[in-house]
Each structure stands twice: as C-alpha cells, then as structure tokens.
C-alpha cells in the first residue's frame, strides 16, 4: 500500500494557523474529522494527548508526528499540516516544527496499513524530502513528492538485502520500540542505520512495531555482537541478551543521538545485562532517561505496581459491575434465605463477586512478579497472591506477594547460573516454578500472612471507629488525589487504596474516591454549559461528552481541558473533587462496588446523599472555572 492511499488532498493543510502545540493538535484533528476519518473526534484527540504526555512527538529537524491507534478512527489516515514560520511543538531539539504529520490508525489496523504509516516516518528522516515538502506550492505537489520517494516494504527489503553492509569495525545490533509502534520505532531504526552507514559500521536493527517484529535478531547474531542498543519505551524481549553488553535508552535517543549510541556500542561502553527481566528503555546509565522518566527505587516500584494494577482492572470492573447489576433485585438478592432472592441475581453475584473479584489479589500479585522477573515470576506471584486472599491478608498481602515472588525468581536466576547452557530449557519449566512457588509459599505462610492479616483487621477497625471529622478529612484527601493528575500516579494510588479497603470489607473510602473521580469531567461539562462565553464552540461540544464520561467514572475525560489550561482547570478540579469526597464521608456513604459511576449509586447506603455530594462537587468546580477563566472571542 502506498502512503498516498492514506494521505489525500482532503487531509492536507498547507498553512497551519495555530502557533502552539495544543491548538495545532486541535487543528489537525479537525482536518481528519472533516475528511470523515473519525467517529469520535474527542476520543481521538484524547488518545493523541495521552501519547504526547509520554514524550513529545516533536522529534526535531522541524518535524512533529502526533499519532494514535484507537477505535475512534474509522479508516487509517494521515493528515499533513505545514507552517513555514514554525510552531512551538515542545520539540526535542527545542526548535519550531514546520511539518506536522498526524497519523490515525484503527484499533484493528491490518499490517498493510501499519507498514505504510510506519514507512512515512522513515521518509521524513531525509533532509531533501523535508526541504521539498516545505517548498511545495499545492496539495498535488505534496502528493507527488511522497509518491516519488515512497517504496513498498518488499522493495525496501530487496534493496536492503542487495546492498552489502559496509566493511567496518564489527557488527552491532539494535532494537527499537515505542508504545504505539507506528512512528518513533521506525524513525529510530532509520536514524541508527543511516548513521552506521556514514560511520562505516555494520548494523542490524530489529523493529517492534504495530505490525509485529521485523528483522528479528538471531541467536548467532546476538552471540557475535560486541554490544546491543535497545532504544525502547515499552517492554521488549530482553532475556536473550543476558551476559551481553546492552545499552538501554529511550526510543527518542535513537532518533536524536544515533552517533553517540553507535560509538558507545562499538567501544563496548555499556553494562553487561544480568537478566533482570526488564525491557524498559529508561536505564540508570542514560542521563536522558534519568531526566525524563525518573530513576531509583520509587520509579521502579511504581512501574511494577502499575503493571499489576492495570492487569487487575478488567477483573475489578467486570466483576464489580456484575455484582452491582445483581443488586437491582435487592442488596440481599443472592441470599437463598432472603425474601428478595432471585436465581439470576445470585448467578451474577456468584460470577462477579465469588469468582472475578476473588481473583483480583492473585492477578495483581502475578503481574507485579511478572513485571519484575518476566514470565517465570508469574506463577509464584499468582500463588502468593491467592494465599494472601485465603489468609485474609488482602490487598496488602497481595502487593507483598507480588514483589516477594518477583525478586525470589530474580535471585533464583542468579543462583542457577552454574547450570550448563544445554540445560537452560529446564529453568523456565521446572526450576523457576518449583523453587519459586515453594520459597514464595513458605514465606507467605510462615512470615507474611499472619501479621499482614492482623494489620488489615486493625486498619479496618480503625477506619470504622473514626469520628466524622477524621472521616471527612480522609474523604477530602482521597477525592482531591483523584483529580490532581487524572489517571496518573496519585489517581491510581487513591483508586488502589479504595479497592484494598473494599477487599478488607470497608466501603467508605471508595465512595469518596469514586465521587472525586467523577467530578472533573462533570465540573467541566457544567462549566461549558453555564459559562458559555468562557469556552469556544469546540470546547462546548466536547463538554457534552464530559457529562457521559463523568457519569461513568472516566476521570480522563477532563484531560484535554486540563492539558489546554492546567493552571485554572486542575486547581478547580481538585477543590471540587475534595468537596465531593469530604461530603460523602460527612454523610457516611458506603459503596461496595469498585466501578460504575452514578449507575451504581443505588447500591450505596444513602443513594440520594451520594448523588448530592457529586453534584455539589461538580457545581463548585464549575463556579471556580467560571470565575477564573476569561471570556473567549471566537474568530
């Protein structure tokens, strides 16, 4: 497939009007929307902003490639926008962006589409193409330039195989990967290959893109390589590099600093990889990684914890909503001895409560351990988490089990390094499961479970004994945490605490947490309705969507507004969410469902007071926004 089957005259804008990043993104999203490529403009924009929050797609050299792969895209497409004066896109080199290519990929985009999208990023690495695009005078000229240089993947591979690698100082290997696998993955690969050719160095680059792994490194190549560059912002297969010198960096380093990386690899200026199981690019030896993504124990702990929480959430949401639906027939409708007993309600409660929700601690522990030690950590983590559930050690016991199992397996990997390479196949199928489950199980049974269960029991009793003042303070803190970063670490920490308390049998904290999480989008929706002169027409349209997202407990619905005006929106959201959280505790509302938004309000002990708390919080936020935001003048 040619790139110009995705980039058409209808998705080209020769003169971008906006000068700042947020407005440029909005302008380019509008181009795709008007061309009929999107079914949910706001959801697509949120996906773009979410990708930008990870690292800027302004890669330098005057190029920005915002991209997202989401179900809000009808057909894969590329939009092109040009600014001869340049726009402030927060590019990695600090320079203005002149060429903006916005890539829209469908959730189920086939390989043909993805390969064409990926090929675009490699074309833009060539200076002569960028110059031609800047000087083109019409949409047709843009199309002609792309067609002139575009080659199908088969042609590229033939050309690559036909041209022997230059004689140099030894063959080095590289792996590139980014979260979406559309742009940065291939731009980093292309930058490394171009620079290696210039330096006279033989290189092979494996790309982990959306269409799968290409040019996969063989065991023999890995064995012979002096060093391996891993430029990746997502997990890649790392155990194959054990014992080799590996330079781990963010994918943007592959684009921005290819010569430095290649020279380090050739000089073997890289640590020996010990097989810890991590595949993230941000390593401690890379200064850029330290500056942008953090380092140290706290960052590592958070990464592993979020791996567990993100994989646990489907069980929480699915199981929790099934339990909530069963309450339509009555709170005790699953009890055969209660007059409200209903067979179908009992089945829903059994599926959601007795099975799905009973797995959450084990799943949490399993995926934490897997994040630490790769697949060998999964089984010991699951077993440890299940033991915590059985011993009433709850969520905290599961957290401990996950980290314990992960590092037990890391220790086992170091202990069994004496085993001959010919017997390596026994490690993942026999040695790690056997000793990992045994050691984790023994430690959980005789060291962890009893004191943690006692602590969880104490914590539950303490929370139940709190007076109104302390409860309100707790509600204010938890509600505010849900709005500070809207889906970020503090939001996830509060949500995780709420789930832990539900698991321990205390339903008050999660009432404040869910109320606080609903306020940001609802407050914005109200503000766009009441204070219409403070928002653009586009914002008012997006505000309608926020009513539904807020009602469904999707805090992230407020992110586009917060990203566009953080100094006004975030403080207002925190105050409103804190008010809602504090009121739920003042009214002593309890909520046994982990998810569901206003649709599970009826299962609280005080449904109307709970809804009132949410409404008051949203109104407070809307009023603050109405006061602090200035009227807008639309063109």
From Swiss-Prot:
Subcellular location, record wording: Cell membrane
Active site location: 67 (tele-phosphohistidine intermediate), 178 (phosphocysteine intermediate)
Top-level enzyme category: transferase
Enzyme Commission code: 2.7.1.202
Official protein name in the record: PTS system fructose-specific EIIABC component
Domain PTS EIIC type-2: 301-635
GO MF annotations in UniProt: carbohydrate:proton symporter activity; protein-N(PI)-phosphohistidine-fructose phosphotransferase system transporter activity; protein-phosphocysteine-sugar phosphotransferase activity
Segments forming domain PTS EIIB type-2: 172-267
Highest taxon listed in the record's lineage: Bacteria
Keywords, comma-separated and alphabetical: Cell membrane, Membrane, Phosphoprotein, Phosphotransferase system, Sugar transport, Transferase, Transmembrane, Transmembrane helix, Transport
List of residues that carry Phosphocysteine: 178
UniProt-listed NCBIfam families: FRU, fruA, PTS_IIC_fructo
Positions of modified residues (Phosphohistidine): 67
